[in-house]
């Protein structure tokens, strides 16, 4: 917390979400040294506007904000903080400072998936969003969304019904009542989850705030689920960030392929997004992914930012680099096996007794339907309908 005032100074002087903050801080590898070099406006790379902002922003203003947050019960988490969301460090232009209300420790202790969509959804999309997010919450997956009306609210609601962990990422200050219809939900979310923003207290929502904010929603998660969006939906900005960050994009197949409300989803499905028919599709993707294998991203300046790139512009490259240096082939095989087993166990949770019997028969290899019927006392025609379970397991082994 000792460096919080200097991180805050950069945010106040150059505004939240400005990548110039990193261009000034990274060369020093220390935010205090960067502040000492920049605050008088003498840094060589600064333009006239930046110099004026630097000399008119005073460190005492930062101390006042810290005191205000303490009085309101808000936490200030900087990029250096151990409670900074790990995956968020691994994106281009991560937020230098997060203002939080709630239980960040609980959030960072589990995997997270983002869920976004339109503010004016169909009944179909609202129901399926709430259902899937609730099922993920029951399985200790955190759900991140943007706290807007419509499908964002449905995502949060589904998690809250299960007393799960959800994160609401705001496009305004924590103390700003927006949207006013969701004010009570803030306190409910903060019990097991967290309300987050990179914007200073008192900041009103503006159009550009939402666009800048969306990179945080996707950046905190291993994947982003889009449940309903037309071609102009703002939720597609979040999906685009997810793709650029090397994260998985999930989409709910449209309830009506001719309905223009789903045109944005259809585009992403055509481009290779993972179709989601239930929460199991998301769980399977996580437990067989690189994030399950290597989800420990610690705070290390040299590894996090290359000498010629501030910060990462392609997290997919980063993942490959980390895997090649940290995971040996034998270890990777063992981790994949472990992830497959966990995905298999989650599948069992949602099976009937007969399906579990068939799954047990298929776990060690393929069997003819007649052999399954003989071993389980299940009709062979019924057994055939269950043999798709082996396909899930085989795919995970590849």
Task: Map each language-model feature to its residues.
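Short, positively charged patches
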Residues: 1-135
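Glycine-biased, small-residue-rich flexible motifs in mid-sequence functional cores and linkers
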Residues: 3, 78-389, 393-398
